[in-house]
Amino acid sequence: MKFFHLSDLHIGKHLFYYSLLEDQKYVFHQILEAAKEEQPDAVLLCGDIYDKTIPSAEAVSLFDWFLTELKETLPKALILIIAGNHDSGERLEFARELLEKEGVFIAGLPPREADEKIRKVTMTDPAGEVCFYLLP
């Protein structure tokens, strides 16, 4: 199996009052090109998706665009997303159940109840099985 691992995207970040959104979109285009060429079986987005717990509308739109393009580029690949300390876990989990039907798994919050378990996602191919435990 082949995986892409991305983290600390910080979508919506500003440096000295300069928005990095255009630069981030350029990087996402590069990632999409690499995904098209390499055809990973899963893409892991591990923490700090956004730069702020309440991201701008433009940052949310850019991430929406990226996920849509990524899924169109890799229709069979799993996309696994966990929140980081810059993210709002509750907001990141928006439409979680709907997205799972499309192979996009999101864990924004750790287990909250004693009987709750860490989210487990399993992939299988001819070589065997891989289990991912989504713990933000």
Label every model-predicted segment.
Residues 98, 102-136:
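Conserved catalytic scaffold of divalent metal-dependent phosphoesterases
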